[in-house]
Curated annotation (Swiss-Prot):
One of its GO terms (biological process) is positive regulation of MAPK cascade. It comes from the Eukaryota. Keywords: ATP-binding, Cleavage on pair of basic residues, Disulfide bond, Glycoprotein, Kinase, Manganese, Membrane, Metal-binding, Nucleotide-binding, Phosphoprotein, Receptor, Repeat, Signal, Transferase, Transmembrane, Transmembrane helix, Tyrosine-protein kinase. This is Putative molluscan insulin-related peptide(s) receptor. GO terms for cellular component: axon; insulin receptor complex. Residues 517-632, 636-726, 756-861, 870-967 form the Fibronectin type-III domain. Residues 1-35 form the signal peptide. It catalyses: L-tyrosyl-[protein] + ATP = O-phospho-L-tyrosyl-[protein] + ADP + H(+). Its cofactor is Mn(2+). It is an enzyme of class 2 (transferase). InterPro entries: FN3_dom, FN3_sf, Furin-like_Cys-rich_dom, Furin_repeat, Growth_fac_rcpt_cys_sf, Ig-like_fold, Kinase-like_dom_sf, Prot_kinase_dom. PROSITE patterns: FN3, PROTEIN_KINASE_ATP, PROTEIN_KINASE_DOM, PROTEIN_KINASE_TYR, RECEPTOR_TYR_KIN_II. ATP binds at L1043, G1044, Q1045, G1046, S1047, F1048, G1049, M1050, V1051, K1072.
């Protein structure tokens, strides 16, 4: 042969194994199931899955389907379509979905399952009530480990919901590790058919369950709260089912019926069904199938084969026995010819010994031998290879003792456990049909005895005399303990000569090794469960070579010497396993073979032996070679336990996997909080039916048992240790649980390979290697990403698929225990542990196990259920009914959920009186946020409250007291009535005199004019709403969704069509409605507010678009402000809010909002409209983020907590009200300026509550005492400057809204000029007033963010000092409509000039104004509040005051709780501020928060007329000295350091009226709605004289008198 050809053949021979293995690996990866890769294991490719319907579809006949196995893919649920009966089992497993994914799934046709229902790890499924609403029967013909229903690790399952299930004919119910599953104990399982308590295994399900059934449920038995268990009230006879209405079904019905007493309308049949009718037995000519239906012979034979490949067969009944349709013939029956002698489909009864014929089988263990039990004839070869076991001979005799004939050959190979063949006690005939493949050495053989190390005897002598081998001889080799004479004796009984057989005289009867040639073996490729070996050929005469035997075994320690014969005794389990391969043809071809079914990451020893004919003089064998398989996915960690030892921690421990399949380096712990379903607890009255904590019950039981043990002898005895029986019982329970879990995993997670066919085993062809076996291999899809973990514990968060909760992951190394920190108290957590290996270069991935899952709840926090005592309050009805309403706030973060409240109360100071305790359910509390005690006796009462949560903690508040007033005596009532009448008379007389005086005083002014103007805020109650041009057709309004609740009703987002010029135009609008239950006055008020808004046409005031007054309900169509009110807008932009991507507003944005609010308020002020409720909640934000003044009182009910009911008056926004409004009820535009300052404080703090820490009553006292809020931390200069001036105590010292706009103009956007009221002809703007706006930033820009400055310097802008004679707010002095200065809107000239120092000072003396801010870093891009939001802590400060000369004694303490130390005593309001000069900063930190900088202005005298403040001031009443603030006013007037703006003649305002204005002021104070216009004064520029208008009309005065009489 040419050398080149030899080299080429050698290359080909070397490449073939590698190519074959590559193809093999590709085939394995192709077969990996992607659906199961997320579970880290590949599902089973098992023949029975064809029966279960995996991966295929069914075409049910008459609604009958075979077994169904649904996993991983929602498409597989199509297998259940049109199925009425599943003849088999239903298995659903391995889904990770959401609840929404199952809500569209429903199979109402399914009524019966003949085997079992199994569900495993179907995440997202909450109930079966919609999935199988009509499932009525589970027969349990075949069980899953003795159970008919199995629910295992169903994480989201809350209830079974099998509302129509009536019968479980056989088997138990196992519900395990379903940590949300409730309503188990409310089911009468005995009624369904599971009467044995041992058959009900309910383990590790939810402990605290509502388990409350509605009242209609009999005996409180139900599947869910609203679904009662059916059939409990059945009054029919025994074993008869009922309909829902109690009507009896027919006796033949099982599980219920549709129509009473009708066998055609049964859900299922007790016996059999034929033609959709229930019958007691099958009619003649039909065959009973599966004990439930009758088939004709054609229908029976047309059935598909069963999973084992058996064809259907007919069995004709005899002597009244039913005819059957079967897959296998029963005992005493054999398969025979059918009546027409055309096919083998008939089971025929045996006359004597039934020749039960079975197919040939390979027996590798006792279980395989049991398959041939009762068989008398084996058609085909019988192969036995049992290497080990206990009582093997006895078990084989039971299974094989009836065999009389084996038609082909008997192979007994490598059965090391066999000593004799006596178990074949009835064997007589062998080899009636010997195949040609069983020919060796030109001869055929029927009996093979090979390599049976411990075989000593063959058959009993008496039996050998009866035995016959019809064809061929016997082949006996390598039976070391089988003596040659025994073999010869057996041949003599068979009448066979040695020439007809192959018997080795060398290898039988001894274990002496033969002369051998060495073979070389190498490992070509390795997988996790397979290896490919290659070895050189047998060098001797190939004609003498029979086969190659691969011997291999697992070794624990490679360091020990490995001997071929070591351990090969009768009782050892450490034996060599073998694989047999036929010789490869070809002169130079190397031999290859594959070992499969290996364990991952395991070391094996292997050697190869060449078997030759008996006449061969040489044998061959390799040396022992070792190799280690690749690692694979570990099994799940075992004994996973989570223990709660702290409210915020869980200690998790586990044990390593049973099958690590590699080197376990770390564990992943994935956990997340399970959301509490609060709705499920609303279905139960916990006052009537209290919750019993399962763990507490167990604890009590354990304690009682401990007491019994401890008290058995004496008190010094300790608890006895557990007995051996108790320990064995516990061990047995653990073993049962482990066995069931292994059994479950075996059927859910299975390897994907099949057994090699026997013929391939003997005729191996290396070219067919990839097609021989289909095996698992690691899939990169199931591996984790490559990570580096530098620390012992690494924590990161991620979102798992199909989960909305935040999922956390912890990785631990070198330990099987971890503590999970920072958990929420009394919260349930799902904990999953995965065992993982490091990245492996051989498998190119990091392998992890499937998840071990457990659930645990953290311990409760005792303080979490405590009610905040500051929220407890009482309201006593004033009608002497003895009714007291007690209100409180629920704990903000309770232990799970507050179920009820306990209210304890009794008469005070009566110790012997038994207190009363009232239980208040959660639903009752939520109705009124409190509870009303009725008909209490007058006197002093004490009470306390406790909240009871799921943790069942009970902690009462401290005792509180209230007094129920005693009703007045009849005599005293009469006296009071008389006194009241007298006082009323004199009051009316006094008022009449005052009115007359006023009228007379105004009458004598002959040159006066009478001007009556309508005040938009006060409309006479007699006036009804009249439709006008604002009326809109109701059909043009379409409501889309709810936006929130208004004061009168719901507010909707809607669309208005054709309300503008274009009839087809649709615009988004906000639609306000009135509740259906609203009174007439409420509807009138609702439309009155709309009437008020008709007068407003300003860009920065929310526009009214129309009104629908006809019909009900009335609608007010407003401009849609898409971003809601400013309060919620600011809160939504806090850094601590959970709004990804939303940043706090920048400083320029806040200043822009402030300018827009000021512009809207300036417009209202010019319209003579006093808002009285300016707050962030009443400012609305458009989609373009433009802020507009809101809806004037319509939002009051939404923020009810922001209002306070003072005395018997209406709700007042006291936290936004000016001092004069709180004390005297005076509301002006300047009191709105005070509120504007509070709004700016809200904007700086992102909508924190003003005066935090103080109650409403304390706020009133706080402001009345002369204190203001502290500026927020990091307050910007501009905002601090404005707030300080807006909060001036005297109204005339506050800026006007137009002055505020001019101050803010340099920071406002250019677009402001185009849309603002300020820049209109009546808005007051003059040329130059807007210079330096945002469009052209100069060096004076100060765009610092809100936290860029300290609070101490917040109001100290870095200024450019330029001489100026203006005041604080630099503005134009002349504009259309009159002069415009710092003071506007009715500030009295004389009041301004009262006590003003008249000294002139030159510019050199330091008269400077704040013209602009100085240079600073531009950080306008920074967020408004970059740090986490910290609610400002309010401290008490005095109001701005510059005229007081008091001392410490003048500052009265209001008695409020101090949240922080009082202001520095050296900086009290009585101290005067130093005059500013060119070297002093008017906003230095020492003044911030206490009083504003002192600026001087030029004083312009007017006709030299200066009068004292006391002479011009008019007070309606003398202030209560207890309510007045610090002494801040001096009789000497304003100090020289006070503000002194330019004086100007202005109209008197309500809070500065003269004596002649007393009627108007009085009416306002009394709250009248009569529109009385004050005397108004106007300015004559040429003379600077005052002109008074005419007095009110006499009819107006008469109306006032009538109102007073009524009061």
């Amino acid at each position: 042969m040419h050398p080149g050809s030899i080299s080429f053949n050698m290359i080909i021979n070397k490449c073939i194994p590698i190519c074959l293995f590559i193809l093999f690996i590709m085939m394995m990866e192709f077969t990996v199931s992607k659906a199961d890769s997320k579970n880290d294991i590949v599902s089973e490719s098992h023949p029975s899955l064809q029966k279960l319907g995996c991966g295929g579809s069914q075409s049910p006949t008459n609604g009958v389907c075979g077994s169904v196995d649904i996993r991983s893919s929602m498409d597989n649920f199509k297998l259940l379509e049109n199925c009425t009966v599943i003849e088999g089992s239903l298995r659903i497993s391995l889904f990770e979905l959401k609840a929404l994914d199952f809500r569209h799934l429903s199979f109402p046709d399914l009524r019966e399952i003949t085997d079992y229902l199994l569900m495993y790890r179907v995440y997202g499924l909450e109930t079966l009530s919609k999935l199988f609403p009509n499932l009525a029967i589970i027969r349990g013909r075949e069980l899953f480990n003795s159970y008919a229903i199995v629910m295992y690790e169903m994480r989201d399952l809350q209830d079974l919901g099998l509302v129509n299930l009536r019968t479980i004919s056989r088997g138990g119910v196992r519900l395990t590790k379903n940590f949300k599953l409730c309503y188990i104990e409310t089911i009468n399982w005995t009624q369904i058919g599971v009467s044995d308590p041992e058959a009900r295994r309910f383990i590790n399900n939810k402990e605290q369950c509502p388990n409350s059934c509605k009242d209609e449920c009999q005996s409180k038995r139900c599947w869910t709260y609203s679904d009662c268990q059916k059939g409990l009230n059945c009054q029919c006879k025994e074993n008869t089912y009922c309909m829902e209405n109690g009507s009896c079904c027919h006796d033949y019905c099982l599980g219920g019926c549709k129509v009473p007493m009708n066998p055609d309308e049964c859900f299922s049949c007790k016996e059999v069904q034929f033609n959709n009718t229930c019958r007691p037995q099958c009619p003649p000519g039909t065959y009973k199938f599966l004990n439930r239906r009758c088939l004709t012979d054609k229908e029976c034979l047309a059935l598909t084969n069963d999973p084992d490949g058996n064809t259907p067969k007919l069995l004709d009944g005899e002597k009244g026995e039913p005819s059957l349709c079967l897959y296998t013939c029963p005992q005493n029956y054999s398969v025979g010819d059918s009546k027409d002698n055309k096919n083998l489909s008939q089971c025929v009864k045996c006359r004597q010994l039934c020749p039960k014929e079975c197919h040939g089988l390979e027996i590798n263990n006792i279980q395989d031998a049991h398959k041939l039990k009762e068989c008398s004839k084996i058609s085909g070869p019988l192969k036995i290879q049992i290497m080990s076991g206990s009582n093997v001979a006895q078990e084989l005799e039971k299974s094989l003792g009836n065999i009389r004939e084996v038609t082909e050959t008997i192979h007994i190979k490598r059965s090391y456990a066999l000593v004799t063949l006596h178990f074949f006690k009835n064997l007589q005939i062998i080899g009636s049909k010997v195949p040609s493949s069983e020919t060796q050495e030109g001869q055929s053989f029927s009996l093979f005895l090979m390599d049976n190390t411990n075989l000593q005897e063959l058959f009993p002598e008496e039996q050998m005399k009866k035995m016959k081998i019809l064809n061929g001889g016997i082949y006996v080799h390598d039976n070391g303990q089988l003596c040659p004479h025994t073999i010869k004796e057996f041949l003599s009984h068979l009448n066979l000569s040695e020439a007809q057989s192959s018997i080795s005289s060398i290898s039988n009867g001894h274990q002496r090794p033969c002369e051998k040639h060495d073979l070389n073996v190498t490992v070509e490729k390795i997988a996790h469960n397979a290896a490919i070996l290659a070895w050189n050929k047998y060098k001797a005469d190939e004609r003498q070579l029979l086969t190659y035997i691969l011997n291999y075994k697992e070794i624990k320690d490679e360091s020990n010497d490995i001997n071929i014969f070591q351990g090969r005794d009768l009782c050892s389990h450490d034996l060599w396993m073998t694989r047999e391969y036929a010789p490869k043809e070809g002169p130079e071809a190397d031999q290859i073979g594959m070992l499969y079914d290996l364990k991952p990451f395991t070391t094996y020893a292997v050697y190869i032996q060449a078997y030759t004919v008996s006449t061969a003089t040489h044998a061959a064998m390799t040396n022992i070679l070792t190799f280690t398989t690749y690692p694979f996915h570990p099994s799940e960690p075992t004994d996973l336990v989570a223990i709660s030892e702290d409210p915020h921690e869980l200690r998790v421990s586990w044990k390593p996997p049973k099958y690590p399949n590699g080197n376990i380096t770390h564990y992943k712990i994935v956990y997340h909080k399970l959301e509490l379903n609060e709705k499920s607890y609303e279905q139960r009255n916990y006052c009537r039916d209290p919750l019993v904590h399962q763990k507490k019950k167990e604890k009590v039981k354990i304690e009682e048992e401990g007491k019994k043990i401890n008290n058995s002898a004496n008190s010094n005895c300790c608890k006895c240790p557990k007995s051996k029986e108790e320990m064995d019982t516990e061990s047995r329970k653990r073993e049962i649980e482990m066995y069931f879990e292994d059994y479950l995993h075996k059927h859910i997670y299975c390897k994907r390979y099949d057994k090699l066919p026997d013929e391939v085993d003997l005729n191996f062809d290396g070219m067919n290697l990839p097609q021989l076996v289909e095996m698992n291999y690691n899939s990169s899809e199931t591996s984790d990403r490559i990570e580096v973990f530098p620390n012992y514990v690494i924590e990161n968060t991620s979102d798992l698929a199909n989960l909305t909760e935040i999922v956390k992951e912890v990785v631990v190394y070198g330990t099987t225990e971890v503590t999970l920190p920072n958990l929420e108290h009394f919260s349930e957590y799902s904990i999953e542990v995965l065992a993982c290996q490091d990245y492996n270069e051989k498998v190119l991935s990091k392998l992890c196990s499937i998840r071990a899952i457990t659930f645990e709840r953290t311990k409760d926090s005792y303080a979490a259920d405590m009610i905040n005592e500051t929220t407890v309050d009482t309201e006593i009805e004033t009608n002497f009914t003895g009714n007291v309403f007690i209100k409180w706030e629920s704990p903000t973060s309770p232990n799970g959920l507050i179920l009820k409240y306990l209210l304890w109360y009794k008469k005070a100071n009566q110790e012997n009186l038994v207190p009363q305790t009232i239980c208040i359910t959660r639903q009752e509390y939520l109705k009124n946020l409190g509870y009303k005690l009725t008909r209490l006796e007058p006197g002093n009462w004490t009470f306390k409250i406790s909240a009871i949560s799921l943790a069942e903690n009970s902690s009462f508040t401290l005792e509180r007291f209230f007094i129920v007033p005693r009703p007045p005596d009849p005599e005293s009532s009469n006296t009071l009535l008389i006194v009241a009448i007298v006082l009323a008379f004199f009051g009316v007389l006094t008022v009449s005199l005052i009115v007359a005086c006023v009228y007379y005083k105004q009458k004598i002014r002959s040159d006066d004019m009478t001007v009556i103007s309508r005040n938009m805020n006060y409309v006479p109650s007699e006036i009804l709403y009249i439709s006008d041009e604002w009326e809109v057709d109701r059909d043009k309004i379409k409501l889309i969704k709810e936006l929130g609740q208004g004061s009168f009703g719901m507010v909707y987002e809607g669309v208005a069509k054709g309300i503008r010029d274009d009839p087809n135009e649709e615009i988004p609008v906000a639609v306000k409605t009135v509740n259906d239950r609203a009174s007439f006055s409420d509807r009138r008020e609702f439309l009155k507010e709309a009437t008020t808004m008709k007068e407003f046409h300003c860009h920065h005031v929310v526009k009214l678009l129309g009104v629908v007054s006809t019909g009900q309900p009335a609608l007010v169509i407003m401009e849609l402000m898409a971003l809601g009110d400013l309060k919620n807008y600011l809160r939504g932009h806090r850094p601590d809010e959970d709004h990804p991507g939303v940043m706090p507003p920048h400083l320029l944005d806040i200043l822009q909002m402030a300018g827009e609010i000021a512009d809207g308020m300036a417009y209202l002020a010019d319209k003579k409209f006093v808002h009285r409720d300016l707050a962030a909640r009443n400012c609305m934000v458009s989609e373009e983020r433009t802020v507009k003044i809101g809806d004037f009182g319509m939002t009051r009910d939404i923020y009810e907590t922001d209002y306070y009911r003072k005395g018997g008056k209406g709700m007042l926004p006291v936290r936004w009200m000016a001092p004069e409004s709180l004390k005297d009820g005076v509301f002006t535009s300047l009191s709105d300026v005070w509120s504007y300052g509070v709004v700016m404080w809200e904007m700086v703090t992102l909508a924190a509550q003003p005066y935090q820490g103080l109650s409403n009553e304390e706020v009133v006292k706080f402001i009345s005492d002369g204190y203001i809020m502290e500026l927020p931390e990091n307050c910007p200069n501009e905002m601090a400057y404005l707030m300080q001036h807006c909060w001036a105590k005297k109204p005339n010292q506050r800026p006007t809204f137009k002055a505020i706009i001019e101050y803010l103009l340099p920071k406002l956007k250019p677009s402001f000029e185009k849309v603002s009221y300020f820049f209109t002809s009546g808005g007051g703007h003059t040329d130059g007033a807007g210079e330096g706006t945002l469009a052209e930033p100069e060096g004076s820009d100060d765009s610092s963010s809100i936290n860029s400055l300290s609070c101490e310097g917040a109001a100290a802008p870095r200024q450019s000092l330029t001489p100026c004679g203006g005041g604080q707010f630099k503005s134009s002095t002349h504009f259309n409509g009159g002069s415009h200065t710092l003071y506007d809107e009715g500030v009295d000239r004389e009041t301004i000039l009262n006590g003003v120092d008249d000294g002139d000072e030159d510019e050199a003396a330091g008269r400077y104004s704040l013209s602009e801010f100085g240079e600073d870093l531009d950080d306008s891009s920074r967020p408004f509040m970059s740090d986490d939001f910290i609610p400002p802590v309010m401290t008490r400060q005095p109001l701005l005051s510059h005229q007081s000369n008091g001392n410490d004694s003048n500052v009265r303490n209001s008695g409020l709780i101090e949240l922080k130390p009082l202001i520095n005593k050296d900086k009290r309001p009585g101290l005067s501020s130093p005059r500013l000069n060119a070297r002093s900063n008017p906003f230095s930190s020492e003044y911030i928060g206490h009083y504003p900088p002192t600026l001087t202005t030029e004083l312009e005298t007017l006709n030299g007329n200066q009068s004292s403040h006391n002479n011009n001031s008019f007070e309606l009443m003398t202030p209560d000295p207890l309510k007045s603030g610090p002494a801040s006013e001096s009789s000497n007037g304003v100090s020289s350091s006070s503000w002194r703006p330019k004086p100007i003649l202005k109209l008197p305002t309500l809070n500065q009226a003269r004596v002649g204005d007393s009627v108007g002021c009085l009416c306002l104070t009394l709250g009248t709605r009569i529109n009385i216009v004050k005397p108004i004064e106007t300015v004559r520029p040429e003379t600077n004289t005052i002109r008074y208008l005419k007095p009110p009309h006499p009819m107006l005065i008469w109306s006032t008198l009538k109102m007073v009489l009524v009061l």
